[in-house]
Design a protein with these regions (language model features):
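HAD-like aspartate-dependent phosphatase fold
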Residues: 1-117
Length: 117
């Protein structure tokens, strides 16, 4: 894949970590193997990965360790912009700045409009 270096933000629950249910949250389910393999390949090609999740504190630490130990993914940033982005914009916004957001809850405006019909 030749697309220049991209920054990819990926959600944890329901995206990287699947087979969970609300009743058992914050249970750590199984890895989304296809996504994990694709992300690892992209990182090997030089792309930047950011873990982008609502988890915080100990639950966030568990998720980061799960990704590292169980999936072999070491994120370039966790719930934060990378240093190059902070430098470029002269600060750090609350919104993660990236080229792609991967999230089980997301949708494009076109999909959202169709949901309203």
């Amino acid at each position: 894949m030749s697309m220049g270096r991209k920054i990819i933000a990926v959600d944890f629950d329901g995206t990287l970590c699947i087979n969970q249910d609300v009743v058992n949250w914050p249970y750590l389910g199984q890895p989304n193997k296809e996504l994990v393999e694709k992300l690892k390949a992209l990182q090997d090609e030089g792309h930047v990965l950011i873990l982008w999740t609502c988890r915080e504190g100990e639950l966030l630490e568990q998720a980061v360790a799960w990704c590292r130990n169980f999936c072999g993914i070491n994120f370039d940033a966790v719930n934060d912009n990378i240093e190059a982005t902070k430098t470029f914009f002269g600060g750090n916004s609350r919104k993660i700045s990236c080229d792609y957001y991967i999230d089980d809850k997301g949708c494009t405006p076109d999909v959202f409009y169709k949901l309203l019909l």
